[in-house]
């Protein structure tokens, strides 16, 4: 039973490894959903990985993907992931035509700071305080509370060290 469980675990680990063929076939299935009723994801992956002979299933995938902004390539998984995350150019043009969105795009272009300004802004927002970073807007009261708490901790540590030293000396002298 343990051997069967270990085999199953190993197989699940290997199947969870991300490959571009899996992504390509998933995208293809989504694009061809209305036209292909008998789409087999497993066969598509096998054909993509060139473990099976090219069949009529992989050819429409490559054609449909070539027409769009998608590209099927087992050697370049980053391109497919980037294409999945990026909106299409036509969608972006449609959004830019809308007045509210267009004004947001223009504002973003105007307010993009330079590299030097970004460094200055980051330096203003973060200040090193008591071993951690706190925002520049943090109130003086909170910082005073941190100082007071750290002072309490110091006193506690000093007292606990002194008491442990007393116990050790008493124990060594045989008075315990």
UniProtKB/Swiss-Prot annotation:
Report which residue ranges the record marks as coiled coil: none
**Listed GO MF terms:** opioid peptide activity
Family annotation (InterPro entries): Nociceptin, Opioid_neupept
Any chance you could tell me the propeptide residue ranges?
Answer: 20-95, 169-176
Record PTM: Specific enzymatic cleavages at paired basic residues probably yield other active peptides besides nociceptin. The N-terminal domain contains 6 conserved cysteines thought to be involved in disulfide bonding and/or processing.
A Pfam entry, by short name: Opiods_neuropep
Taking the first listed entry, what is the main subcellular location of this protein, grouped into a coarse class? secreted
A GO cellular component term found in this entry reads: plasma membrane
**Signal peptide feature range:** 1-19
The record's subcellular locations are:
Secreted
- UniProt entry keywords in alphabetical sequence: Cleavage on pair of basic residues, Disulfide bond, Neuropeptide, Neurotransmitter, Opioid peptide, Secreted, Signal
Task: Say if the entry is tagged with keyword Disulfide bond.
Answer: yes
> Can you cite a GO biological process for this protein?
sensory perception
**Where on the tree of life does the source sit, at the highest rank?**
Eukaryota
Protein family membership: Belongs to the opioid neuropeptide precursor family.
* Protein name, entry field: Prepronociceptin
Tell me which species this is from: Bos taurus (Bovine)
